[in-house]
From Swiss-Prot:
Homology family: Belongs to the class I-like SAM-binding methyltransferase superfamily. TRM5/TYW2 family.
Subunit annotation: Monomer.
Biological process terms in GO annotation: tRNA N1-guanine methylation
Protein name (database record): tRNA (guanine(37)-N(1))-methyltransferase
């Protein structure tokens, strides 16, 4: 009975445990497979743990030479190819500091003998070629001492070498480390030169057998010497036989034996170093790391494959001429000798996605972490912040772009809480607040493509302009630019960027995209029949543009020439007017010189007018660039906009209306802010200078829905239209990208244009790509 109860209790226990496991798998799958304890498994909690984790050692050959001969190596481009190039590690080391890191050249060091063998055979070939050349020229000398003794040369540093030097001083010697390509060429040359010795009947005489034995005699292991003797005998027999097939088989077996006899430590070093070199990337580690590294590595590999023999001969020549020795040294590397990419690969070798999923915006590094990296994102952020001195802030995007202004919630991972940053793209300075404004550095290639596509003297209409980067770029091609964004913060920095870059051909607006396009339709800007464009602009656009620039074909020459002095005078006058307005409400003594001919009553009336202008600006929004209707006055009772004022009225008439309207209204404080005061400025632009129109609609989430606004454009009879090219960006699945664009165009226009061009911009996710559809609106109107 007892055993039965025990059996039932155990059965019940296992059944409940099994049920809990099934419940976790089905209901709590995310928590079960979320890699929450990844950093705990690595035992990394801070930067000190990271530094300890990434330490490694490297055994490498070094050139040991006098400090006065170092420049001959460094200035030789061919020899420089073989030098070690590790991030923030010196190319030249002091002998005194690294003498304790020397690896002893004992009698069993096969790597050293292999290098001796290659170097001496190189000298033998060179001497043999010199003798041959001398014999052809009739200057043959029977002295073969050099030829006989070259194989006995030891090119490695030793204590005996030190004793042979008079007045030895440690301060006078330097070490130059060699890279992994040097190790690689050693193996290749070793097998290649042995094959040449085996195949060449002339070289393989008795004297050459003896000279070859000198290379490995005494300094090589007993097993290797026995193996070498067997190979020599076998090779002599094969040279006298007429069985090439057996010779090839014997040769293959010999190569295998040589590989086995080769120092295993060297092979392991080569393999490990190749793995490390795959992480080498001296370029910016925060932008397309994997692709950039592959390109760099391929370039170096190509150089190696094409010029390795020339370069190694050049190095051996320098070694012979300058009496340079070799020494194997143990070098230690760590956190300071690795860039961001290498450190992340070392710590997280199985997670490639963290290497390339962040971008730089000025001093801000923006990362997109997946769930499985949630527990280690702080460590990664600290590494990025510490290894990149230009980065001050590291952030993570918490959610997707799901609002009108295309901004997202920011999670500060490391660094300063400062999101106002500056960056430079194609010599254009851009300032923005990354927390309040959308910016994507990955669209640089698309901006360059549009720049190359647009011709000079075009008209640019950027409906969703952001900080105005498209207009800032295309303004260099003497284009008339209209840049708009509904985000008031983007509008603010758009004007700041125009001022920073000293552009004088960009008009800026802060309106809804549909309303912005409708107002431009009323300007008849699409028509070739309209020769002069008359605009009424606000104070901000008055500062942004220059009529001399807009009415010239080459904006750059005009802007840098005569117009420069005019702009200075205009700016001086504007500054004087601004200073007057600011100082009117200050003490009488400060304004005495500026307002000598004005009486107190006029000053008071002017102040009343200006302050009421501020009130009117706050009460009723100003609609820019409307020829037919102007928002001039504001009704006190219902705050409705008055649209009945003609566009031909002068600025003085508007001022008189303001004075009459608010003459008797009480003034509050005398130092009221006048910064928002706006007046209408009439400008005329010669449209005959400009040709095609390009409408940029970079709002991929909803841009296709805005196409229906073009149906409101009414073409007049006998009206010849310009080419109006639409560049509409959108998201779509890769298998339906063309059908998606075609469907939306048909939906809004009931027909398709003659030519439709669709370009893939970038991959947002595996099932979501960004495209741009381009067509001529002229075909649909």
């Amino acid at each position: 009975m007892f055993f039965k109860a025990l059996f039932l209790s155990l059965y019940l226990f296992f059944f409940i445990s099994y049920a809990e496991i099934i419940f976790c798998i089905r209901i709590k799958r995310n928590n079960l497979y979320n890699f929450q304890n990844m950093t705990n498994s690595l035992n990394i909690k801070n930067l000190d743990d990271v530094k300890e984790k990434v330490k490694y050692e490297k055994h490498t050959y070094c050139l040991l030479l006098d400090k006065y001969k170092v420049n001959k190596i460094l200035k030789n481009k061919r020899a420089k190819f073989w030098l070690l190039d590790i991030y923030k590690f010196p190319s030249v080391l002091k002998y005194k500091e690294y003498k304790n890191c020397f690896l002893q050249n004992d009698h069993n060091d096969k790597n050293n003998h292999m290098l001796n063998f290659i170097y001496n055979n190189y000298l033998k070939k060179r001497n043999h070629q010199n003798v041959k050349n001398e014999s052809e020229n009739g200057n043959y000398n029977n002295d073969h001492n050099d030829h006989q003794t070259c194989n006995n040369m030891n090119i490695f540093f030793s204590n005996e070498y030190l004793k042979s030097l008079s007045n030895f001083n440690e301060e006078d010697f330097r070490l130059i480390p060699l890279n992994d390509f040097f190790n690689k060429i050693l193996l290749e040359l070793f097998y290649k030169q042995r094959e040449e010795i085996i195949h060449d009947d002339v070289i393989y005489s008795k004297n050459n057998i003896k000279s070859l034995s000198h290379v490995f005699n005494d300094n090589s292991p007993e097993q290797y010497r026995q193996k070498e003797k067997q190979q020599q005998v076998g090779n002599i027999i094969m040279c006298n036989s007429n069985s090439p097939e057996q010779y090839r088989q014997k040769e293959k077996q010999q190569q295998v034996d040589n590989i086995i006899m080769c120092d295993e430590n060297l092979c392991e070093t080569l393999i490990k170093d190749d793995e490390i070199n795959e992480n080498d990337d001296n370029k910016n580690p925060l932008e397309n790391l994997c692709e950039d590294f592959k390109k760099d590595k391929d370039d170096i590999e190509n150089i190696y494959n094409m010029h390795k023999l020339e370069y190694i001969e050049e190095l051996f020549e320098l070694i012979k001429e300058e009496d340079i020795k070799f020494q194997r040294v143990k070098l230690e590397f760590g956190y300071d000798n690795m860039n961001t990419s290498e450190i992340l690969r070392k710590i997280f070798p199985c997670i490639n996605e963290i290497i390339h999923k962040f971008e730089i915006i000025g001093h801000i590094a923006h990362l997109n972490f997946c769930d499985k990296l949630e527990s280690c994102k702080k460590i990664i952020a600290e590494i990025i912040l510490d290894k990149n001195k230009s980065i001050k802030t590291v952030i993570n995007k918490k959610d997707i772009l799901n609002n009108t202004h295309r901004t997202f919630n920011i999670e500060l991972l490391a660094g300063e809480n400062n999101y106002v940053t500056q960056l430079k793209e194609n010599n254009i300075r851009v300032k923005l607040n990354y927390e309040l404004i959308y910016w994507n550095s990955k669209l640089k290639k698309e901006r360059d493509r549009i720049y190359n596509l647009v011709k000079d003297n075009s008209i640019i209409i950027d409906v969703f302009g952001g900080v105005g980067i498209f207009s800032l770029s295309l303004s260099k091609k003497s284009c008339l630019c209209f840049s708009n964004d509904i985000n008031e913060h983007a509008y603010k920095y758009m004007n700041i960027n125009i001022s920073m870059n000293k552009n004088k051909n960009i008009l800026t607006y802060n309106m809804d995209g549909r309303e912005f396009l409708e107002k431009l339709f009323n300007l008849k800007i699409f028509s070739k029949n309209n020769n002069v464009l008359t605009l009424y602009i606000n104070d901000q656009n008055q500062k942004n543009i220059s009529l001399d620039v807009l009415n010239s074909k080459n904006h750059i020459i005009t802007g840098n020439g005569k117009n420069k002095s005019k702009n200075k005078n205009e700016n001086k006058n504007e500054n004087k007017n601004e200073n007057k307005n600011e100082n009117k409400n200050e003490n009488k003594n400060e304004n005495k010189n500026e307002n000598k001919n004005e009486n107190k009553k006029d000053i008071q009336n002017n102040n009343m007018c200006e302050k009421e202008n501020n009130i009117s600006d706050r009460k009723c929004p100003y609609i820019h660039n409307n020829n037919n209707q102007r928002n001039i006055t504001c009704d006190n009772n219902n705050n409705n906009n008055n649209m009945n004022v003609s566009g031909n009225n002068s600025i003085h008439q508007y001022t008189d209306m303001y004075e009459h309207k608010f003459k008797y209204q009480k003034i509050g404080e005398e130092n009221m802010d006048n910064s928002k005061n706006e007046e209408n400025h009439k400008i005329d632009i010669n449209l005959n200078i400009y040709e095609d129109i390009h409408i940029l609609m970079n709002l991929p989430q909803t841009a296709l829905e805005f196409l229906n606004v073009f149906k409101k454009y009414k073409k007049e009879k006998n009206d010849e239209l310009r080419n109006v090219f639409i560049h509409c960006y959108y998201f779509a699945k890769p298998e339906f990208f063309y059908e998606h664009a075609e469907k939306n165009i048909l939906l809004h226009f009931n027909q398709l244009p003659k030519d439709i061009k669709i370009t893939e911009i970038r991959k947002v996710s595996p099932s979501k790509l960004m495209y741009v559809v381009e067509f001529n609106l002229k075909d649909l109107l």
